[in-house]
Amino acid sequence: MKEIAVLGSTGSIGTQTMDVIRLHSDLFHASVIAAHKSIDKLREQAAEFHPHAIVITDEEAGTKFLETYDGDADVMIGEAALSEVVKREDVDLVLVAVVGITGLLPTLEAIRAGKELALANKETLVAGGALVLEEAKKHHTLIRPVDSEHSAIFQSMIGQDQKGIHKILLTASGGPFRGRTKEELAQVTVADAMKHPTWNMGMKVTLDSATMFNKGLEVIEAHWLFGVDYQDIEVIVQPQSLIHSMVEYVDGTIMAQIGLPDMRLPIQFALTYPDRLPSPSHAFVDWSEIAQILIAKPDMKVFRSLKLAYEAGKMEGDGGVAFNASNEEAIRAFIAGKISFLSIFDVVEDTLSHWSAEPVVSYESVLSSDRKARALADAFISRKCL
């Protein structure tokens, strides 16, 4: 029985992880569940899965949870608890599915504690990739990616010599606004941006998909995960979401991971690696119904997020921190109705153009850069609100 700590158990990835654990209750047990403030869902999960420990990072929500919780799990409150709970002896594997750089310190602590690691948090590598890779190398930890694209790349590299890689082909669905012009995007609302054509995801990830900032984050993530130069990472649009990503080798061979879009598949593989279990949905591709596989290049003039991601990544140091933090602030402002959809790109571009990259030397340096980038982005947002 493998004991799993699910950090972010009430979110989109977290609930689908719990689905996988439910399907394979003979193999897995959720020894730890953790959420920010979704305590009703957390209470339901506690009743069903009987964890040994529960973490609520929001203080107020944690206090409210304790008022009605009558189970026997250890209840820990506050963000710092995430970094403590991953060290528990009753944890074999940590799946990090919290949002934002909140995931960085628990990831580092899980590696230091010798735990298996499944990573679903893009920001951890985008902001702190240098730190995470250094610790992973030191402790001989294999980072198992949960993102469908990075899982696909990971699977396409199994048994291959990394020196033989020519290029990573990172696929994107194109989001709800694929093929739109700048003029057509000028009046986009939050409701419009939440209509993803393929995946059912949380709000932040769905909005990032609409702007293609998610793909920008994934470019930087792929660089760190697989040690591939930015010039050898190419984004392509595959609107059917059948090809989840590909690896092209120096002899011209392309290895691809293809399958129906179901996030439980990469989650399950991260938990069972190197073994495979039956499909959670028991659904398979019916090739007789697929007349063609569509491939296109992304419009990097409309979706400047991709160009900005490459720029941020090539800055090295804390360029990724600035990219991520300014995007998060811009998304918040868009949701609040303070800026337009297209202004999201402007805020990140302005932040990066005024950014002087510094080395990432510690967790504290990441937090410092994050605060600086948010302040800079907020200043640009304020000007756009005038």
Where are these regions (language model features)?
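Catalytic, metal-anchored helix/loop core of enzyme active sites in primary metabolism
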Residues: M1-L386
